[in-house]
Amino acid sequence: MRRRLGKRIAALLLLVLGTGLSACGGDGRPTVLVAAASDLRFVFEEMEPQFEERCECNLEFSFGSSGTLATQISNGLKVDVFASADSDYVEQLEKASLILPLTRQLYAVGRIVIAVPADSELEVETLADLREAHVRRIAIANPDHAPYGRAAKQALQSAGVWEAVVDRLVLGENASLATQFVETGNADAGIVPLSLAISREEHLRAILVDESLHEPLRQEAAVLKGSRHADKAAAFLAYVNGEGRSLMRQNGFVLPGESLQR
């Protein structure tokens, strides 16, 4: 009888300990789960080591299109932070009461570029140049759920070239995939985030698109309700908007309070 009772107590202790450790990394430190727009991949990964040391925690990123991530969060995906490439998807989650009050914040304004492979012989300097027949495939992120794809579509429409190129578009599931299409030569050109073009500058040539041709890419973030580590999640956003500003700027983002004219 005592042996059975002892085994039950041991099993119960393992269950309790396992539940407590599920929100921690293998080193026992808490893990902050961050769902982030794909244009943030390289800059967030640059921030990761210093912030982890500072907060004595681990960061775990899930990158994708903002719309897809927002849908997953609405459907129950458990994360601590949502960093979107626009403000609309954060607002949607706020209206659904899925973010912690007072944590929603602007952290950057994004820019888009026309990009071609570095070794390409194409002379593409303006959106109008994309009309040329020898530009056979043009990559953008899917505008239905990717803010950078929506901005690319708006820019093409504003420049009066959308109808001429729509049948040549190659849609990436997110901005990172659209950038890869250009880098690997699976597209002759693309309209992609400046941040990703900078991170791949050895492989891409890029020209800034006039920001007046599309709605501003006001990138917002928030801490999610139900976060197990809301204090550390908020600390990460404070880091992005504080010490991380220099890295954001180096990666092509316009920061809150700064002018778009650059």
Give each language-model segment a name.
Residues 1-11:
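Bacterial N-terminal signal peptides that target proteins for export
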